[in-house]
Amino acid sequence: MTFIGMLRPILYYTLTSPPSRSTLLSAAAIGLKLDIKDVNLAKREHLTPEFLKINPQHTLPTLNDNGFILWDSHSINTYLVRKYAKNDNLYPKDPAMRAKVDQCMYFDCGSLFYAMSVIFIRPILYKGKKGIEESEMYLIKDAYRVLEKMLDGKEWLVGDSYTLADISNVCSISTLELLKPFDTYPNIKEWVKRCEKNIPGYVEWNLPGVEKFRQIMKLPSSNL
């Protein structure tokens, strides 16, 4: 979608980040072209004065839409859909359905991505801890258990087609699988396959992002 006289929204991102990928997939799903800026976390580019001026929380993704600054992927994704999408399929206007999409996105940040952050990103990536104890896996197992139940008898998390709920959650769980496979959760397994097949940008952005995450974290391709 092109708006005359307006520049493309700028997205600061890193491909290893599931939230960043969810925004790339959301934009792809509505046909929105972004001016993407890769932020190198290893070089601490997210902590430079220039970036901190944009986002003092120094998180990715961060959006600059012609001077309007927004961070947190769930906030960005809903904003982009409401402003640029041709319809409300990804974020339904119906109050009940929208509330369910919101609920599922809160589940992503409060369970799936939270588990990844607590078990892996903070202690191992940032603090140098060596390895993961099996006893720490309960957060992932519990998140899988809940998501498996949420998908009972359904193809998508909310409604009859994919929404922002599916996009956010699948970007997280496809990365979490590197830590804990979900082979024993049939609903999740089939849902991830549907997401890969149907969600625009999944093959272009999410699959390479998961692989890059694996390489950076030195995880074996056969999973842990």
Where are these regions (language model features)?
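C-terminal helix/juxtamembrane-tail motif
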Residues: 207-224
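Short, flexible helix/strand-to-coil boundary loops that buttress conserved ligand/catalytic motifs
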Residues: 55, 74, 116, 151, ...
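GST-like fold's C-terminal all-alpha helical module
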Residues: 104-197
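Conserved beta-strand edge residues that scaffold enzyme active sites
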Residues: 41-42, 165, 209
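Short, hydrophobic secondary-structure boundary micro-motifs
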Residues: 88-93, 114-116, 157-160, 202-207
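Charged phosphate-binding loop/patch that engages nucleotide di/tri-phosphates or the phosphate backbone
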Residues: 194-197, 201-212
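GST-like domain detector, emphasizing the conserved glutathione-binding G-site
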Residues: 2-134, 223-224
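Active-site-flanking alpha-helical
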Residues: 81, 172-173, 205-206
